[in-house]
Amino acid sequence: MKSNKKILFIGAPGSGKGTISKILVEKYKLVHISTGDLFRKKISEDSQFAAQIQNYLSSGSYVPDEITNKLVADFIKKIPKNQGYILDGYPRTLQQLEFMIKNGINLDCVFYLKIKNETIISRLSQRLFCQKCQKSYNLLLAKPKNELKCDLDSTDLITRNDDRPEIITHRIEKFNNSVIPIVEFFKKSGIIYYLDAEQTLEETVIEIEKWL
């Protein structure tokens, strides 16, 4: 099954954006555009870039808009026009939204994943990542088959620096402060749908599929 829909997920860290995106990408043959993944890939390829943005990522701050905009725009240019995709983690600021509009990055639907702060902290404290392929796991929601080993390549799983409680709290505050104008814009456009991210991932995916 293939979809050509252009989709955006808005949600705080830990709302399930990445995991839900991966489920839909596999089922509907969509391209997953995650700013976090783009940053990590660029860091692994470019030591100068790594030095430039590592401090932003490790402190839970946003990477400057001009850097993020260029990475996302360059990636989208490579995608065929009839190919559907999911934007995960972009736009996060009003400036990024304005860049999107100016550069004709259009969307068919926007899903806002609503979640309580305490749930976010609980989920993120249980996240693990593969050091080699960057696949993510969650000991509450999406456990690895082998504890602390990646299902794909058996590499040791690690936690990320930005999943420490004090960094998580900062990231939540940053998200809440920046998301309001973005949500308001898409509300006026009539393409935003609100989802309860407190429910299971399976239940959330079923809701999303009603609009695909």
Swiss-Prot record:
The keyword Methyltransferase does not apply. The gene is adk. One of its GO terms (molecular function) is ATP binding. GO terms for biological process: AMP salvage. Consists of three domains, a large central CORE domain and two small peripheral domains, NMPbind and LID, which undergo movements during catalysis. The LID domain closes over the site of phosphoryl transfer upon ATP binding. Assembling and dissambling the active center during each catalytic cycle provides an effective means to prevent ATP hydrolysis. Some bacteria have evolved a zinc-coordinating structure that stabilizes the LID domain. ATP binds at residues 14-19, 127, 136-137, 199. Keywords: ATP-binding, Cytoplasm, Kinase, Metal-binding, Nucleotide biosynthesis, Nucleotide-binding, Transferase, Zinc. It comes from the Bacteria. Its EC number is 2.7.4.3. InterPro entries: Adenyl_kin_sub, Adenylat/UMP-CMP_kin, Adenylat_kinase_CS, Adenylate_kinase_lid-dom, ADK_active_lid_dom_sf, P-loop_NTPase. Pfam families: ADK, ADK_lid. Residues 34-63 are annotated as: NMP. Residues 126-163 are annotated as: LID. This is Adenylate kinase. Monomer. PANTHER family: NUCLEOTIDE KINASE. AMP binds at residues 35, 40, 61-63, 89-92, 96, 160, 171. It is found in: Cytoplasm. GO terms for cellular component: cytoplasm. Belongs to the adenylate kinase family.
